[in-house]
């Protein structure tokens, strides 16, 4: 089965975790697309640029280049990966035709890497998108604020969108946004959201398990 995996930029803040993800992906025999977030590098550079008065577009560009740097690092750990980081969907598809593993970061200002991951999943006709996130599942409310928040193992995109719009989900924008949801809904691609600190959850999904939250159309 074709896999598309969205790696939170926070994964790249833990050296051992990066290597663990590389091992899991190398062990998988099928085709894999990976989209990396910008992480701490992006946040730091954007903060400095914002303080200096840079436009939102310029701040987005810094985040994009940070995510591409993470992508290039990840490529260096994967023998079967395309050695070039695609910068748009056309370049991604070109690499996809030639390589077993293709890794990319952001594409353009105003577009999250969550949307990039959705576009990639759509373009390669992947049945599922695996989101290694900075939370372990989707909750009805922020569990840090409300300890009684309900963990939601299965939900629809419509239900998930309502939770996002209520602004109670931690890391919501990084997790998914309106554009990414619309792309995934129109293709009926199933998304699995799980704790990004546990790369073994990729293997769990492949075994038919649900280690976090499963979002369907």
Swiss-Prot record:
Sorted alphabetically, the keyword list is:
ATP-binding, Cytoplasm, Kinase, Nucleotide-binding, Pyrimidine biosynthesis, Transferase
Q: Which residues form a coiled coil?
A: none
A GO molecular function term, named singly, is:
ATP binding
Q: Which InterPro entries match?
A: AceGlu_kinase-like_sf, Asp/Glu/Uridylate_kinase, Uridylate_kinase, Uridylate_kinase_arch/spir
Record has Nucleotide-binding as a keyword? yes
Annotated residues that bind UMP are located at: 38, 60, 107-113
- Residues reported to bind ATP: 6-10, 39, 43, 134, 139, 142
Reaction(s) this enzyme catalyzes, per UniProt: UMP + ATP = UDP + ADP
GO-annotated cellular components: cytoplasm
Localization of this protein: Cytoplasm
* Gene Ontology annotations of biological process type: 'de novo' CTP biosynthetic process; UDP biosynthetic process
What's the superkingdom here?
Answer: Archaea
Q: Name one Pfam family in it.
A: AA_kinase
Q: In which pathway does it act?
A: Pyrimidine metabolism; CTP biosynthesis via de novo pathway; UDP from UMP (UMPK route): step 1/1
Q: State the activity regulation.
A: Inhibited by UTP.
Coarse class of the protein's main subcellular location: cytoplasm
The EC number(s) this enzyme carries: 2.7.4.22
PANTHER family (alphabetical): URIDYLATE KINASE, URIDYLATE KINASE PUMPKIN, CHLOROPLASTIC
Query: Which family is this sequence assigned to?
Result: Belongs to the UMP kinase family.
Q: How does it assemble?
A: Homohexamer.
Q: What does this protein do?
A: Catalyzes the reversible phosphorylation of UMP to UDP.
NCBIfam families in the record: pyrH_arch
Spell out the protein name for this chain: Uridylate kinase
Name the species this protein comes from.
Pyrobaculum islandicum (strain DSM 4184 / JCM 9189 / GEO3)
Q: What is the lineage of its organism?
A: Archaea, Thermoproteota, Thermoprotei, Thermoproteales, Thermoproteaceae
Instruction: Give the gene that encodes this protein.
Output: pyrH
């Amino acid at each position: 089965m074709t896999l598309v995996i969205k790696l939170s930029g926070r994964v790249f803040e833990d050296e051992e975790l990066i290597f663990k993800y590389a091992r899991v992906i190398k062990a998988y025999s099928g085709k894999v697309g990976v989209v990396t977030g910008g992480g701490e590098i992006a946040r730091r550079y954007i903060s400095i640029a914002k303080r200096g008065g840079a436009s939102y577009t310029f701040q987005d560009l810094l985040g994009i280049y940070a995510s591409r740097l993470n992508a290039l690092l990840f490529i260096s750990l994967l023998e079967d990966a395309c050695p070039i980081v695609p910068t748009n969907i056309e370049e991604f598809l070109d690499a996809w035709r030639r390589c077993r593993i293709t890794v990319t970061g952001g594409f353009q200002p105003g577009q999250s890497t969550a949307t990039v991951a959705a576009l990639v999943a759509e373009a390669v006709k992947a049945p599922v998108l695996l989101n290694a996130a900075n939370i372990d599942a989707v909750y009805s409310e922020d569990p840090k604020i409300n300890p009684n928040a309900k963990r939601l193992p299965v939900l629809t995109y419509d239900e998930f969108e309502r939770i996002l719009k209520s602004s109670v989900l931690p890391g919501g924008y990084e997790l998914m946004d309106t554009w990414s949801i619309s792309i995934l809904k129109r293709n009926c691609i199933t998304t699995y959201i799980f704790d990004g600190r546990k790369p073994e959850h990729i293997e769990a999904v492949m075994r038919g398990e649900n280690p976090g939250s499963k979002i369907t159309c």
